[in-house]
């Protein structure tokens, strides 16, 4: 009799355990969207972002770095050998995933010191760790200019908020093309 009660209690215990709801926020939906950027050179603050207008979502990385130039002036300012590495945190260097109640204009939302007021963030996840690597690949060189492809990659990043945590070992934010005068 005791064995039967024990088995019933054990079955009820396992049946009552729950892993909770599985929430999957696809971070790879941004792969076809254009990488955009802006900066405030006086404050040494920079933002790279992609926006999925179909779902009103954005993924952005903002950081402060006194040595980084969003538009390098010379070829000497670009290294194809070593990427620029920025350590993410919860305050100054962040990867942000946001969902909005309406579509947004990236320049208006990310590039103004005061964001537009008629847009509400319905979900926000903020990085708690990880790194951002900004790497350059030589595309073409002429007598007057050099063209690079710049890739923004997050490594070992965790973004969290509202009881949700998402971890990615590798997440490519996007690429853009920059031209530097020789």
Name each model-derived stretch:
Residues 57-61, 150, 167-171:
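Short beta-strand segments
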Residues 52-144:
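Surface-exposed helix/loop patches within compact recognition domains
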Residues 43-54:
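Short, hydrophobic/proline-enriched secondary-structure or compact coil segments at domain edges
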Residues 14-45:
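Bacterial Sec-dependent N-terminal signal peptides
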Residues 1-17:
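Sec-dependent bacterial lipoprotein signal peptides
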Residues 146-148:
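Flexible beta-edge/linker motif
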Residues 153-182:
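Edge beta-strand at a domain terminus
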């Amino acid at each position: 009799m005791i064995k039967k009660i024990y088995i019933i209690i054990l079955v009820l215990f396992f049946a009552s355990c729950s892993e909770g709801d599985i929430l999957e926020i696809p971070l790879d939906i941004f792969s076809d969207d254009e990488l955009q950027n802006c900066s405030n050179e006086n404050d040494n603050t920079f933002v790279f972002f992609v926006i999925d207008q179909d779902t009103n979502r954005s993924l952005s990385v903002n950081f402060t770095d006194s040595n980084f130039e969003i538009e390098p002036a010379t070829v000497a300012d670009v290294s194809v050998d070593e990427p620029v590495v920025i350590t993410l945190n919860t305050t100054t260097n962040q990867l942000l995933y946001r969902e909005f109640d309406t579509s947004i204009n990236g320049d208006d939302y990310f590039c103004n010191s005061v964001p537009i007021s008629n847009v509400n963030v319905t979900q926000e996840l903020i990085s708690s760790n990880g790194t951002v690597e900004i790497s350059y690949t030589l595309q073409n060189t002429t007598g007057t200019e050099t063209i690079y492809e710049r890739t923004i990659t997050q490594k070992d990043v965790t973004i969290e908020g509202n009881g949700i945590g998402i971890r990615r070992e590798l997440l490519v934010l996007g690429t853009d093309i920059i031209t530097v005068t020789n």
